[in-house]
Amino acid sequence: MILGIGSVVDAPTAALYLQLGANFVVGPLFNPEIAPVCNRRLVPYCPGCGSVSEVGKAQELGCDICKVFPGDVLGPAFVKGLKAPMPWSQIMVTGGVKPTKENLEGWFKAGVTCVGMGSNLFPKEAVAAKDWGAITRLCKEALEIIRSL
């Protein structure tokens, strides 16, 4: 099993979770102080980036995959525009990604490597009702859509 930690905004928090065994670190923002903490332990750091400059700097500091966040604000056009001058970039998008063919197709056609869909795959109502079948169906449907792209 691979277990990561998300929404990390500072180096001490990253270090704490790495000591507890996290296999990767994801952040909503790009904090250059987190990269060396993760690099020292050979643990991937996926920072949240909102500009081409942030993606470029994150790559220089060893981030193989950069998270574009918030995806619903930046949109697939941002990813397509970023990849034009930087085609080597591996992009994960989160924030507003929906488990629908139209939405996922837009992101993958733009060039993302992967997507994150937390709350859209785990709706609060389904979690509160402990409707694990509904959550399982949503996840399976999303994977089927991604496989078809």
Please state what every model-predicted region is.
Residues 38-43, 108, 124-149:
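C-terminal helical cap(s) of enzyme catalytic domains, especially alpha/beta-barrels
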Residues 5-6, 93-97, 115-119:
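Glycine-rich beta-strand-to-loop/alpha-helix junction loops that act as flexible
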Residues 19-25, 40-46, 60-65, 85-90, ...:
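Glycine-enriched alpha-helix->loop->beta-strand junction motifs that scaffold or abut catalytic
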Residues 51, 75, 135, 139:
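Aromatic/hydrophobic pocket-lining residues that form the small-molecule binding cavity
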Residues 73, 80, 88, 100, ...:
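Mobile acidic interaction elements
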Residues 1-9, 21-30, 43-55, 64-73:
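Catalytic beta/alpha-barrel core
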Residues 25-34, 68-75, 111-132:
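Glycine-rich phosphate-binding active-site loops on the catalytic face of alpha/beta enzymes
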Residues 10-20, 53-61, 78, 97-115:
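Catalytic cores of alpha/beta
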